[in-house]
Amino acid sequence: MTTISAPSEPYRAVRWWLISVAALIALMVLVGGATRLTESGLSIVEWKLVTGSLPPLSAAQWTEAFEAYKKIPQYRELNAGMSLSEFKEIFWWEWSHRLLGRFIGVAYLLPFLFFLWRGGLSRELKRRLWLLFALGGLQGAVGWWMVASGLSERVEVSQYRLATHLVLALLIFAGIVWTVRRLKERAQIAAPARLRFTSALLLVVTFVQIYLGALVAGLRAGRAYNTWPEIDGALIPSAERLWFETPWWRNMFDNVLTVQFEHRMTAYALFVLAALHAFDAVRSRAGLAASGALWLFAAVSLQAVLGILTLLNQVPIGLALAHQAVAIAVLTLAVMQTERLASRQSAETQPRVVPVSQPG
């Protein structure tokens, strides 16, 4: 049987496919952010995987959708008297968010099946791609679980479920970014072990900050305490105000003041850690890791400025979405920096021998 050696970049097509999916996920997160900021997330009160792909196409269908929305607490307590045209405005945001989610599922699954049929994927890569697909399916379920939390007793979705939904989306995104980088041969960067540790720590703190940011969003905490650097009249609020709920740990997730304070403090920690990592990388002459650290520090700095401006201006949609977009950029750079400094031994990059006479 005649065979040919795999090309120098055996996974070039796979990489571009995954890059496209990652870009779609980033767009999905931003559309989700706009859906939340416009209070549109509860405008569709049911989940229909297939038939839900089509919006209302007649006046009767629009009336039916609007009447269903009128039955939930959000309409009765916040939007009573809303017109049909106003309902359509919030409906389109949520419908677009769900449609994009379906499109991402198709954009991932169909090429994945093709690459499986074509062959040439390593066992490790196939396991990773199946895991990402499973997480994508879980994300769809988590999205409906989140929406369901606001349909019976609340006028908004649970901040816990919102944070879970966002973090899972960006965990999938980060997994794809890591996988894309692992699919291309790169020389191992000679750098001190402490740089590998601080890059990984930066990635962990970035995820923690994203989670806290989602809690802030879910509690509408960005519309309170709109001063900086003071919060509630002081640099550090009083313990009585921070910890008045019982049990004490609930304040970390439910107390608007405490959650915003946590988000601020974590932002400061992330800024300092990024600065120290960049200084150490440059001083250590770590090559590409030094430039990567500087880019990461620049993104964290920009994110801090945007966060302050968003707070001081009481969360205008444009600034809030810019803040969310730069958060995705910070996460991307943190993943790239961690992968750059990690061990380069990877099963995904092993060349394969592909038979000419058959697909795989």
UniProtKB/Swiss-Prot annotation:
Top-tier EC class: oxidoreductase
**TM annotation in the entry:** 13-33, 99-119, 129-149, 160-180, 199-219, 265-282, 292-312, 315-335
Enumerate the Gene Ontology biological process terms.
heme A biosynthetic process
The UniProt keyword set, sorted, is: Cell membrane, Heme biosynthesis, Iron, Membrane, Metal-binding, Oxidoreductase, Transmembrane, Transmembrane helix
Location relative to the cell: Cell membrane
Q: Which residues form a coiled coil?
A: none
Q: Which GO terms describe its molecular function?
A: metal ion binding; oxidoreductase activity, acting on NAD(P)H, heme protein as acceptor
Q: What is its EC number?
A: 1.17.99.9
**Known InterPro entries for this protein?**
COX15/CtaA_fam, HemeA_Synthase_type2
- Describe its function: Catalyzes the conversion of heme O to heme A by two successive hydroxylations of the methyl group at C8. The first hydroxylation forms heme I, the second hydroxylation results in an unstable dihydroxymethyl group, which spontaneously dehydrates, resulting in the formyl group of heme A.
Under which name does UniProt file this protein? Answer: Heme A synthase
**Which species does the entry assign this protein to?**
Bradyrhizobium diazoefficiens (strain JCM 10833 / BCRC 13528 / IAM 13628 / NBRC 14792 / USDA 110)
